[in-house]
Amino acid sequence: MGRQFAGICGARGSLYGCVVCNTYLTCSKELTSKAFTGSTGPATLFKRAWNVVYGRCEHRKMTTGWHTVRDVFCVTCNQKLGWMYEMAVSESQTYKETQVIIENANFEKIAGAIKDPLGEDRQEAPPAPNLEMSRYPLEAEKKSRPQYRTVSVSSSSSAEC
């Protein structure tokens, strides 16, 4: 059986997956910071993650203050990966809200850089349209138009509709 994933959802750059089952979790474009510490050691803050399930909301005292968090688990193997910040009490910590901490021991790089299938990373400008050429020549366009005749209708008081 191959890797399970619900979707890559516009993932670009390096892909990261669960260390146990290699299920796709997130990508390097979603990375916010590597300067975090989890319960098992270093951790990484990502804007979002896919193929995860969330536990119940809990209030936890962390090194930066009180936070409302949910544990995050791999959808395939149920490995605990880290947590998601639901709410921060301190105003200076609100940037973490809705972001996901994944402990470095629980994920690994699963692929090199991938090519953007939609071409959204393209830096060059799109080609300018050629306005001199048209789909139909002007004369052919005139000939293909339906010709309508105008008919005048006089109304009389004795005419019935």
From Swiss-Prot:
InterPro entries: Yippee (IPR034751), Yippee/Mis18/Cereblon (IPR004910), Yippee_fam (IPR039058)
Region (Disordered): 117-161
Tagged with keyword Metal-binding: yes
Comp. bias (Low complexity): 151-161
Keyword field: Metal-binding, Zinc
GO cellular component: ubiquitin ligase complex
PROSITE patterns (alphabetical): YIPPEE (PS51792)
Source organism superkingdom: Eukaryota
GO molecular function, one term: metal ion binding
Domain Yippee: 14-111
Transmembrane segments: none
Binding site for Zn(2+): 18, 21, 74, 77
PANTHER family attached to this UniProt entry: PROTEIN YIPPEE-LIKE CG15309-RELATED (PTHR13848)
Similarity-based family: Belongs to the yippee family.
Protein name, as recorded: Protein yippee-like B0546.4
Organism: Caenorhabditis elegans
